[in-house]
UniProtKB/Swiss-Prot annotation:
Gene designation: katG
Crosslinked residue numbers (Tryptophyl-tyrosyl-methioninium (Trp-Tyr) (with M-264)): 92-238
Keyword terms of this UniProt record: Heme, Hydrogen peroxide, Iron, Metal-binding, Oxidoreductase, Peroxidase
Active site: 93
Lineage, broadest ranks: Bacteria, Pseudomonadati, Pseudomonadota, Gammaproteobacteria, Lysobacterales
Family: Belongs to the peroxidase family. Peroxidase/catalase subfamily.
Catalysis performed (reactions): H2O2 + AH2 = A + 2 H2O; 2 H2O2 = O2 + 2 H2O
GO cellular component: cytosol
Post-translational modification: Formation of the three residue Trp-Tyr-Met cross-link is important for the catalase, but not the peroxidase activity of the enzyme.
Protein name: Catalase-peroxidase
Length: 748
């Protein structure tokens, strides 16, 4: 008899075995709406991170972080006796996953702690950086989140190396499990790129970049990276430092750089500043072949305790470290701010070489060994650069900026400070979310500024009178609801942009978006502006109402009237205090990325996409931070209120539009109706009476999914039930109010 006990569960465990997605890979991901619930959060429901951060002694914490920078540990010794460059990389790679396409990624949730980011090839050794920070995090506990601490540490690292940063804002709350909604690409191998480009791009092997035979310069010049991705290969933050797919061509690399940094909201000047500024510090690591490097953290053994990439070469650390496979130190002052990067970039001619790991890099021609060794003060090395560094000299636009920065170090320092602040704060949303004594006073255009409240607010009596005025103005329930929804639903919970505050729906580019029906929108806004002007002219004591508030109040009035028509007296909660932004405060190009490609709540799609309409609905709902029941009740309510774009009848499953009823659900689930697609594309459907064949309804995939998908049908059945009318109205009002207030960080 063996000493190993027989497993009572036949060697299976909870969660093991074939899953639903194994059987049905295209199953709708309704579960994406259930992320980051209280069930995964170890903190009390009453915990308020903002209040905890406000009590933090930030200056003392920064002093302790500064001391850590030069407190080299034997288990992971600091390059050049200074951890600053490592922590700059940690902060950069935390924030640098942000992309403008959907606002997801970034450092705002502390996701670098979790898979896949904690095990990305581009994040080798950052597990050690976080472990070096653990004693400080342990000391301060929940007074500072991991998300804030990683960014703050990057700032302190720069300051400890003689650089003056632009500022720091806290306010990033940790999450406690990996994000599931982030689309990183479809590749199944690290550093692959075969799916993100239309022409295919085999990528590179796990060791380092290698030139792939079927990629030529012409293809690489014209390839188009899939949206919303902002990295050229699976597991990279931005670009391959050896060049596209390992092709050491600086001009081709410039194209990838411009594309990926642009998708992170950086222009050419910010891009040059970030690359040159970041590469003023530290080094890359490629002491030997990557075959010496073991599994990443998520694949490591229990005894590794969450650390990965064990290195069998030499000591496995210090001068024997292997990360990217490249072995480059850019400056003679790798732990001190200087202009050395540009001095070397333009002061030497460069020839292609290879690192000890076999990766493409560049070495200065006819140069002396002037670069310090990271761990042996008696050694000097030749100046080296990456292919992506040389892009700043070879690309004409980048070169012009680089030469200007070289000649004007103060401009370079200011540009890097501002670009670093933008990099590390881009996903935080408006300044109203910024916390701490180091928040810079200057207001920046990319922060989507909104004027500070400068007038007395309306009271409940004013709101009631204004609602009556709006309802008597000739505007319909559908028009008021659609306008309020269009304004508020531009919000993205990913990067906290958009929303009703600012009334940017009246400004370019939002006023011209097809989803907002520009002609109807102009009519509604003109009427509301007249009501606003008339009300404000009659007030005393500085009381005013903004158009942003009036748009929401008008939508609330329409919802109340529709509920009353259904026999339910409700008052939709309303909190005044929104302000109106100006066109000068609105970056048209920056806001363009917020335009919806689809909005299932309005049965709108800009075009037909490879992604299903119902999947795009889930995506939109997730960006609006909605749960599955909230999404369901909103779709059903908006349909019967007539909020469809273009006044489409698709999904309007009611004979009494404008009445806030549960008719959408009752009629969708009516077994007397038989549904058939109207074309081979199966985008729209027709519902006919099973017995008579009489036409009853038309609907889209977004409508029918609430009867087709088993999870959504379960929710829809609740609202379709005979006893659900009052619950439906109350739940709709609650979900509507949530969307209207998503950007009201001042109410928190």
């Amino acid at each position: 008899m063996t000493t190993e006990a027989k497993c009572p569960f036949n060697h299976s465990v909870v969660g093991a075995g074939t899953t639903n997605r194994d059987w049905w890979p295209k199953q709708l991901r309704v579960d994406l709406l259930n992320q980051h619930s209280a069930r995964s959060n170890p903190l009390a429901a009453s915990f308020n991170y903002a209040e905890a951060f406000k009590r933090l002694d930030l200056q003392t914490l920064k002093q302790e972080l500064r001391a850590l920078m030069t407190d080299s540990q034997d288990w992971w010794p600091a390059d050049f006796g200074h951890y600053g460059p490592l922590f700059v990389r940690m902060a950069w790679h935390s924030a640098g996953t942000y992309r403008t396409g959907d606002g997801r990624g970034g450092g705002g949730r502390g996701q670098q702690r979790f898979a896949p980011l904690n095990s990305w090839p581009d994040n080798v050794s950052l597990d050690k950086a976080r472990r070096l920070l653990w004693p400080i995090k342990q000391k301060y506990g929940q007074a500072i989140s991991w998300a804030d601490l990683m960014i703050l540490t990057g700032n302190v690292a720069l300051e400890s190396m003689g650089f003056k940063t632009f500022g720091f804002a806290g306010g990033r709350e940790d999450t406690w499990e990996p994000d599931q909604d982030l689309y990183w690409g479809r590749e199944t191998k690290w550093l692959g790129g075969d799916d993100r480009y239309a022409h295919g791009s085999p990528g590179v092997d796990q060791a380092h970049g290698v030139l792939v035979k079927d990629d030529d310069s012409e293809v690489q010049h014209t390839r188009d990276l899939e949206n919303p991705l902002a990295a050229v290969q699976m597991g990279l933050i931005y670009v391959n430092p050896e060049g596209p797919d390992g092709n050491p061509d600086p001009l081709l690399a410039a194209k990838d750089i411009r594309d990926t940094f642009g998708r992170m909201a950086m222009n050419d000047e910010e891009t040059v500043a970030l690359i040159a500024g970041g590469h003023t510090f530290g080094k890359t690591h490629g002491a030997a072949d990557a075959a010496h490097v073991a599994a990443e953290p998520e694949a490591s053994d229990l005894e590794s305790q969450g650390l990965g990439w064990h290195n069998s070469f030499g000591s496995g650390k210090g001068g024997d470290t292997i990360t990217s496979g490249l072995e480059v130190t850019w400056t003679t002052t790798p732990a001190q701010w200087s202009n050395d990067f540009f001095d070397h970039l333009f002061g030497f001619e460069w020839e292609l070489s290879k690192s000890p790991a076999g990766a493409h890099q560049w070495v200065a021609k006819n140069a002396q060994a002037i670069i310090p060794d990271a761990h042996d003060a008696s050694k000097k090395r030749l100046p080296t650069m990456l292919t992506t560094d040389l892009a700043l000299r070879i690309d004409p636009a980048y070169e012009a900026i680089s030469r200007r920065f070289h000649a004007n170090p103060d401009q370079f320092a200011d540009a890097f400070a501002r670009a670093w602040f933008k990099l590390t704060h881009r996903d935080m949303g408006p300044r109203a979310r910024y916390l701490g004594a180091d928040v810079p006073a200057e207001e920046l255009l990319w922060q989507d500024p909104i004027p500070a409240l400068n007038h007395a607010l309306i009271d409940a009596q004013d709101a009631a009178a204004l609602k009556q005025t709006v309802l008597s103005s000739g505007l319909s329930v559908a028009q008021l609801v659609a306008t309020a929804w269009a304004s508020a639903s531009s919000f993205r919970g990913s990067d906290k942009r958009g929303g009703a505050n600012g009334a940017r729906i009246r400004l370019a580019p939002q006023k011209d978006w097809a989803s907002n029906e520009p002609a109807q929108l102009a009519q509604v806004l003109a009427t509301l502006e007249r009501i606003q002007a008339d009300f404000n002219a009659r007030q005393s004591g500085g009381k005013q109402i903004s158009l942003a508030d009036l748009i929401v109040l008008g939508g609330n009035a329409a919802v109340e009237q529709a509920a009353h028509a259904a026999g339910h007296a409700v008052t939709v909660p309303f909190a005044p205090g929104r302000m109106d932004a100006s066109q000068a405060q609105t970056d048209v190009e920056s806001f363009a990325v917020l335009e919806p490609v689809a909005d299932g709540f309005r049965n709108y799609a800009k075009a037909r996409y490879a992604v299903s309409a119902e999947a795009l609905l889930i995506d939109k709902a997730q960006l609006l931070t909605l749960t599955a029941p909230e999404m369901t009740v909103l779709v059903g309510g908006l349909r019967v209120l007539g909020a469809n774009t273009g006044q489409s009848h698709n999904g309007v499953f009611t004979t009494r539009p404008g009445v806030l009823s549960n008719d959408f659900f009752a009629n969708l689930l009516d077994m007397r109706t038989e549904w058939k697609a109207t074309s081979e594309t199966k985008e729209t459907y027709e519902g006919r009476d099973r017995a008579t064949g009489e036409h009853k309804w038309t609907g889209t995939r977004v409508d029918l999914v609430f009867g087709s998908n088993s999870i959504l049908r379960a929710v829809a059945e609740v609202y379709a039930s005979a006893d659900a009318q009052e619950k439906f109205v109350q739940d709709f009002v609650a979900a509507w109010t949530k969307v209207m207030q998503l950007d009201r960080f001042d109410l928190a």
